[in-house]
Curated annotation (Swiss-Prot):
SUPFAM superfamilies: VC0467-like (SSF143456). Belongs to the UPF0301 (AlgH) family. It comes from the Bacteria. This is UPF0301 protein YpsIP31758_0835. It comes from Yersinia pseudotuberculosis serotype O:1b (strain IP 31758). Pfam families: DUF179. GO terms for cellular component: cytosol.
Length: 187
């Protein structure tokens, strides 16, 4: 089972404040473990523009018509000072990995220098921190009914309002997440 380019949808019974009602986009999943970004937990009072100001990144070709008030997301509890830009594919950045034909992740500063310019990726989200699982841990959490999974949907990823992403991801499975029983059997 490879869950790269899938959503993990927290079951209603998950009460850990880091992951309660979360949707995680899985960026990498292999025999060594998994890594993903929480895509529905905004960091209060932190926008892309604020990040650019703190890092003193000013582009001479900044287009004032391009909004930079997108909220920055709490990508997970690990390396919360490290930035991850999830975006539609665009070549030319120093440290990017293709996740799927519709998404790639970049961790190098050069992508930040394109934000607010005509050269920025078409779709993007910025997250600080990430979530990860060691070998076999995610698979065990799935067996323990901690998460639902579904293939990722770039509309949910980039266009659905943050507060609606948990329900929208569950809707892909044809379910109302609020109607799920906290305990499930394994028949």
């Amino acid at each position: 089972m490879n869950l790269q380019h899938h959503f993990l949808i927290a079951m209603p019974s998950l009460q850990d404040p880091q992951f309660k009602r979360s949707v995680i986009y899985i960026c990498e999943h292999d025999e060594k473990g998994a890594m993903g970004l929480v895509i529905n937990k905004p960091l209060e009072q932190l926008t892309v523009e604020t990040i650019l100001e703190k890092l003193k990144i000013k582009s001479p070709s900044r287009d004032p018509a391009i909004r930079l008030d997108n909220v920055v997301l709490a990508g997970g509890p690990l390396a919360e000072d490290r930035g991850f830009i999830l975006h539609s594919p665009q070549e030319g950045f120093a440290s990017s990995i293709h996740i799927s034909p519709e998404t790639m992740i970049t961790t190098s500063k050069d992508v930040l220098e394109t934000l607010g310019t005509s050269g920025q990726p078409k779709n993007l989200l910025v997250a600080l921190g990430y979530a990860s699982w060691r070998q076999g841990q995610l698979e065990q959490e799935l067996l323990d009914n901690v998460w639902l999974t579904t293939e990722a949907d770039t509309h949910i990823l980039f266009n659905t309002p943050i507060a609606e992403r948990w329900q929208a991801a569950a809707n892909k499975l044809g379910i109302n997440i609020f109607n799920i029983a906290p305990q499930a059997g394994h028949a």
